[in-house]
């Protein structure tokens, strides 16, 4: 029995009965919606047959909060809610803006000093830049709020972002513009070099 498997651990088993609830066509690029999902640049591509969030353009049309999230957020959960994110559970903005605000809320709430971003090339540089801007502002808010409470609040290092770009090799002059347009401070390449040398290349644009 599926439920008993969890209960024997013991783990509370809870099920979502609203199987027809989903992000919706405004949020998700998905072949099932009759849209093309295979852009050559990888930005509007359903990687590994997974739906893709429509976050390529931060200035895209505003979207509303999906119904399943509205239902979830109707019941306050003070033990797990992030207060800094509550103001972004309403209204409308582009998908990229919602995502950037939600992620930056963790920075504002917990004083996170940087992000390591995975599979960077599948999200536009403009959207990454937006995340960098929101996170930088969020960290400044956290530091101002926590002076005298946390030693890190007195740090002056800017918010740091490093990105993983498969088969990137290196780009010391930032010709790819991941630094200038994407807001990244460094990049790492997890491509496996067949020669067995330089397996990981870490470059800092400056």
Where are these regions (language model features)?
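Core domains of carbohydrate- and sulfate-ester-processing enzymes
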Residues: 2-79, 199-206
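Active-site-proximal helices and loops of the catalytic beta/alpha 8
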Residues: 3, 19, 101-206
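Solvent-exposed, acidic/flexible segments
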Residues: 43-46, 92, 96, 128
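Active-site mouth loops of central-metabolism enzymes
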Residues: 53, 84-97
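Active-site-adjacent bridging/hinge elements
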Residues: 69, 73-77, 99-109
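Low-complexity, polar-biased intrinsically disordered regions enriched in Pro/Ser/Thr/Gly
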Residues: 81-88, 143-149
